[in-house]
């Protein structure tokens, strides 16, 4: 399939799919009225995935993103998720954005979307680190 499409068309197809995924997330968010828990998680995962793709393209080494770059991404995606949820409630319902943002980091309100995105980002980063460690070339013993 890739060979038939050619590299340019394949890249174009990927860009179209990224745009469709963004539109699908926005559509999901618009269809949810007050319960925007799931669309917010979807948006956070999308932010993390697009950040990963960007890092892979800019700092990736042999198809992998180094762990020091994944850690800030694992922090940025949940923060953007919490900010998106706070912005939504502030614009749609007039709720204080700072209070909604702070609620994402309180355990009294249960697991919020930012916490779930953080857990997923950390889990994927750890799996990536273990995978890199297991596949790294091991020094071979030298015999005299």
Question: How would you name each of these model-derived features?
Answer:
Residues 1-144:
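Membrane-embedded alpha-helical bundles that constitute the cytochrome b-like, heme-associated redox core
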């Amino acid at each position: 399939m890739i060979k038939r499409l050619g590299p340019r068309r394949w890249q174009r197809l990927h860009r179209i799919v990224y745009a469709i995924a963004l539109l699908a997330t926005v559509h999901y968010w618009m269809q949810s009225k007050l319960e925007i828990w799931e669309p917010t998680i979807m948006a956070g995962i999308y932010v993390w995935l697009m950040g990963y793709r960007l890092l892979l393209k800019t700092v990736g080494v042999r198809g992998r993103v180094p762990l020091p770059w994944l850690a800030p991404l694992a922090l940025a995606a949940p923060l953007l998720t919490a900010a998106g949820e706070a912005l939504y409630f502030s614009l749609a319902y007039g709720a204080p954005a700072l209070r909604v943002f702070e609620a994402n980091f309180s355990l009294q309100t249960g697991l919020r979307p930012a916490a779930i995105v953080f857990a997923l980002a950390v889990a994927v980063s750890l799996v990536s680190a273990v995978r890199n460690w297991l596949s790294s070339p091991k020094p071979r013993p030298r015999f005299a």
